[in-house]
Structure formats: C-alpha cells, structure tokens
C-alpha cells in the first residue's frame, strides 16, 4: 500500500533515450493543429525555454486555446496566435524553465490528510518516552473531549522504537476504555491496546490469546505467548479494520481533505497522482468525495485510485468491490487500479529476497505465485490494472512471473518501489510492457544507515538499492513517486526528488553518495516526473508533455533545472502551476 521502504534514506529515476521516439534537441516549429499563418487566436501564449518531455525537445513557445495546446514550436510561429487585447502573453525568457506539470505515481495524500484531521501525527524525531509520556496522553485527552470512539495516530519510527517492548500494557496504563491504534511512519507496523485487540479477536480481555496468526503479518507475542500489542505488516491492517472506520472517516471529512490535498499538489507542481490506498479506511468515502469534487468543477488535478487487497481478505469479494468503484469514474477521477503488498521492506528485514539476510531469514511473502497469477488474470479481465508494492528481488521475480503468465501486456501492470531486481527480470519487464513507479526519492542513505545496511542486508543489497538507470537502459517505462507521507526523511516535491536522482545524495542529511552508477540524467528525471507518470495512468494522449492537442498542464519553474548547478536543483519551485490552460497556483 503505502509506504514501503523505510528508507530512512532513499531515491528515484527516469529516461534518457525514449525508446521508439527520436530524441530531439532544439526547436520544432510545426507542432500545431492549425497551419501558420492562422486565423485561430489563442487564449494564452507562453515564450521561454520550454522542455516538452517529448524526447529531449526544447522549444521557444506554445499557444493555448480552450485549455489545450494548439501550437508548440518557435516564437515566430506562436506570434500568429496572438490577438492584441485578448490573448494573454507571458514572456518567461531568462526566468527559469517552462515544463509539463508533474505527476506522482504512488502516494497517500488521502490517508495523510485524513490522519491529520482525525488523529495524531508524530514527528520522526519523537522518541518512545515522549510517545508514552506526552503524545498518547494528549491524544487520549483530545479524543475524550471530542467524543471520539478511537485514539488514532501515525508516524512513529520503527527503526528506533524497541520491538521487544510490551506496547499493549503501556497503552492500557494510559487508556483502556476506548481503542488505541498508532501506525508507524511507513504504515507497515502498528501498536494497539487491549481494548482494540479484543475487538479484533486477537485475545480475550483476561490475556488469553485467540487469533494470533494473521496471514501476511505477525502478531508479536511475549515469552508467555500473549500479544504485546506490536503488530507487523498486515496484522496491523487486520486489527485496524475493526475500528469504527465509517465514523472515523466520513464523506464530509473526505470532502474537506480534498481541498487541502489539491492545495499541496498544485503548490508542489503536481497535477496528477495515483493514490496507493484509496480505501484505507475500509470504505468508499474518498472515492465519493473525489467524484463530487470533479462533478462540481472544482478539481484541478487528475486522480488515480487503487483499491487495496490484503492477503487476509476474500480476494474475489474485494475484486468485485474494486470493479464496482468504477461507478465513481469521471473526467479527472480514474478508479482503475488494485493495490497489494508482495512483501515488506528490505530496510526492515521484511522484503522478500535472495540471497537471504545475514541471520538466515528471507523476509515476508504475502502471496504465492499461483495466487498472484490468478488475481492478475481476474483483475485485468475486469479492466483493472495491478499496482503492487514490492521491494525484494525474490518478490520482483514472483510478481513478474504472475504478470507474464496471468496478465495482459496492454494493462500496464506496475511494480511499486523496487529495492532490488535481477537482470533477467528487467528484460522480462521490458518485453511484457510491465511498468515501474520507482522509489527514486530513497536513492540516498545516511552514513549511519549505510553502516547498518552493511551489517543487516543481504549480499548485493548492502550498498545498492532502488535502481533507476537500469529501467531506462532496458526501455521500461518508469515514473517517479514519493509514497507521501511515508517519505522516510526524503522530499515530496519533484525538484527535491530530481536532485537526488542526479547525485545519490539528499542535501538535508550527511551521507556518502548512494549507488551513483544508477543515477540518471536530468532529462530522464523530468520524463519520470511527467510523461512517465502520464503513461502509467493511461493519460499520455491527453497529458504529461507539451504537445499540440493535449491539455495545457504546465509549470513556470523559478530555476532552469536543466542547467543550474546540480546542488541547487532542490531549490527550484513552481512560480505558477497551470491546469487545462488556467493558472491554479502562483507564488
């Protein structure tokens, strides 16, 4: 689902040579829907250095009419579309770069804003003593004052919180009469009190264990076989499903959050994103809110939604629900994906790998190959694309097998994150049009974490993780994503991510550059941020590049990220964001 990679560190990638398209430099003066000179006049004309994301093409100008590009080429050609007093003309020459607006191939803005609204969000620096002495008591007080039926929160750091602590007892000492649940920063772990564990049938109130074997997860037990309240992977989501989610996350709350999500996206330069867990609260309220927002004409981005299937669920029943959510489809809402977890994360030792971890374990595998193959076949037959979290190379092989044997190549079934992949699997991805939304933002690691990786990671993964360049080399369509809010000490904005793809380093931390052989070019990074996402979301004929006939979704960036010093790329921001020809954000 969500946040995978606890890359308390991390990275990203994109494309240099676009297979099948000649890479163009310089200008094209004839990308126009009408001949020049023309009697058609534009609503908007832009001059400047314009990166189109069509190959490496740079042009001087474009014209926009009724929300779409009608001309892309040189300045002289664009001038014919100007009607004095009616056409808005912006000369952005020398001020930065004009480029297509960006996309985020996998994120959880819906969940992030919901938790901010209904729960408590921790800082990564909040230590375990502060959690129990300040954060949880304050959250309980707030819940009781507002009449809430759950104390809910997110964001503790599983890398530093002890795993052998009895969280259940410590939470019970603070509050035992209403359920408590806090997920970790990745969303792969959770802690709960006795009240919630009893509701979920994990144990009796007297401590007697009941259902402690949850497929795809682990209910951690103490020396006496009694749950400690620490829940790994899908054991956490199973327990969380017993919360009163309809009350916790209503349609009204979802509607409120949509406006905040849009504000953040447009400010950062995103006008399309795929939400990796749209049914996070086990209901359809986010779908309903998005559909209503678009119907009201207030939506200034394109939303893709993935319906999550956990390995403890009835797959056929959930597939039917996911297919039914297509009723919420609209111009800017695309409910066309299902999401599932193949494994956990390599950083936490739950990624499914080969060779084994130094202590001899292999990680978590949530699905057999036969199950994945059957699910892929059923989903693709319903017109639903697979969107699968996978980190370890053994998990990648299993999913690629399933996509090849059960899927339709034209469905663009997608791997999400990918810490490690084997050479044979790269080639099969290319051969079968399997897409990747890459954890490029995590292609950096602190010096402290690098030392831990050398100790704890399998061979071949100690100093290498999150490939980027290899996807381009094999001709695999790759997009960028941030997994927000599970950014794991990494940036969410596109230009922060872009700098990491160039350097293997994150400006805000201390660490040797990470696996620089897999760094990519600036043009490749921009492709992954723009047209790569549009292709992943089946939008490339409408969006993702500056081309006549497409919607005019673009950015005026305050820095030329193609030529500025590489260590300054992260400073770039959108001076303005345009969606369908209209300015929807400006600094």
Tell me what each language-model feature is:
Residues 298-339, 412-419, 449-479:
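Phosphate/diphosphate-binding loops
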Residues 99-105, 416-417, 479-483:
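Active-site neighborhood of phospho(di)ester-bond hydrolases with catalytic His/Asp-centered motifs
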Residues 2-3, 7, 21, 29-75, ...:
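Active-site microenvironment of metallo-dependent hydrolases
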Residues 12-23:
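Bacterial N-terminal signal peptides
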Residues 193, 269, 335, 344, ...:
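Conserved, mostly hydrophobic/aromatic
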Residues 108, 330-350, 434-444, 503:
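Non-cysteine beta-strand/loop elements that form the S-adenosyl-L-methionine
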Residues 377-386, 394-413, 423-427, 438-440, ...:
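His/Asp/Glu-enriched, well-ordered alpha-helical/loop segment
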Residues 27, 36-47, 54-320, 340-395, ...:
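Divalent metal-binding segments
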């Amino acid at each position: 689902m969500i946040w995978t990679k606890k890359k308390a560190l991390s990275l990203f990638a994109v494309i240099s040579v676009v297979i099948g398209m000649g890479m163009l430099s310089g200008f094209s003066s004839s990308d126009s829907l009408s001949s020049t000179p023309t009697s058609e006049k534009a609503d908007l004309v832009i001059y400047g250095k314009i990166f189109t994301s069509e190959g490496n093409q740079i042009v001087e100008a474009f014209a926009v009419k009724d929300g779409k590009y009608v001309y892309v080429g040189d300045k002289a050609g664009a001038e014919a579309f100007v009607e004095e007093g009616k056409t808005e003309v912006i000369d952005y020459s020398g001020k930065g770069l004009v480029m297509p607006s960006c996309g985020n191939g996998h994120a959880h803005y819906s969940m992030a804003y919901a938790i901010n609204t209904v729960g408590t969000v921790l800082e990564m620096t909040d230590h375990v003593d502060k959690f129990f002495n300040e954060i949880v008591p304050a959250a309980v007080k707030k819940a009781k004052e507002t009449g809430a039926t759950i104390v809910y929160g997110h964001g503790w750091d599983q890398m530093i919180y002890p795993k052998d602590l009895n969280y259940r007892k410590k939470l019970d000492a603070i509050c035992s009469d209403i359920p408590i649940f806090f997920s970790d920063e990745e969303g792969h772990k959770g802690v709960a009190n006795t009240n919630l564990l009893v509701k979920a049938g994990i144990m009796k109130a007297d401590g007697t264990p009941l259902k402690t074997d949850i497929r795809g997860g682990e209910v951690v037990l103490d020396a006496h076989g009694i749950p400690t309240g620490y829940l790994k992977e899908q054991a956490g989501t199973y327990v969380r499903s017993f919360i009163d989610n309809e009350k916790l996350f209503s349609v009204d709350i979802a509607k409120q959050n949509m406006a905040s999500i849009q504000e953040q996206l447009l400010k950062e330069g995103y006008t399309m994103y795929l939400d990796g867990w749209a049914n996070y609260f086990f209901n359809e309220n986010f779908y309903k809110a998005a559909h209503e927002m678009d119907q009201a004409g207030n939506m200034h981005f394109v939303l893709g939604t993935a319906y999550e299937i956990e390995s403890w669920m009835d797959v056929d029943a959930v597939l039917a629900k996911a297919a039914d959510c297509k009723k919420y489809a609209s111009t800017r809402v695309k409910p066309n994906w299902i999401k599932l977890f193949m494994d956990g994360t390599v950083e936490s030792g739950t990624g499914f790998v080969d060779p084994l971890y130094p202590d001899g374990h292999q990680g978590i595998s949530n699905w057999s190959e036969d199950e994945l193959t059957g699910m892929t076949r059923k989903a693709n037959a319903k017109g639903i694309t697979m969107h699968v979290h996978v980190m370890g190379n053994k998990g990648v092989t299993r999913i690629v097998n399933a996509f090849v044997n059960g899927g339709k190549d034209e469905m663009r079934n997608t791997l999400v994150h990918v810490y490690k992949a084997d050479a044979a699997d790269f080639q099969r991805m290319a051969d079968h049009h399997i897409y990747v939304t890459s954890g490029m933002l995590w292609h950096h690691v602190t010096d402290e974490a690098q030392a831990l990786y050398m100790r704890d990671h399998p061979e071949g993964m100690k100093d290498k993780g999150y490939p980027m360049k290899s996807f381009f080399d094999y001709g695999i369509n790759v997009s960028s994503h941030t997994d927000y809010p599970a950014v794991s000490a990494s940036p969410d904005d596109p230009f922060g991510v872009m700098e990491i793809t160039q350097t293997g380093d994150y400006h805000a931390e201390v660490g040797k550059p990470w696996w620089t052989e897999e760094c990519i070019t600036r043009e490749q990074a921009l492709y992954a941020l723009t047209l790569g996402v549009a292709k992943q979301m089946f939008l490339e004929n409408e969006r993702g590049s500056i081309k006549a006939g497409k919607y005019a979704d673009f950015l005026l960036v305050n820095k030329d990220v193609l030529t500025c010093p590489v260590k300054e790329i992260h400073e770039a921001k959108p001076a303005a964001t345009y969606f369908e020809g209209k300015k929807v954000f400006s600094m």
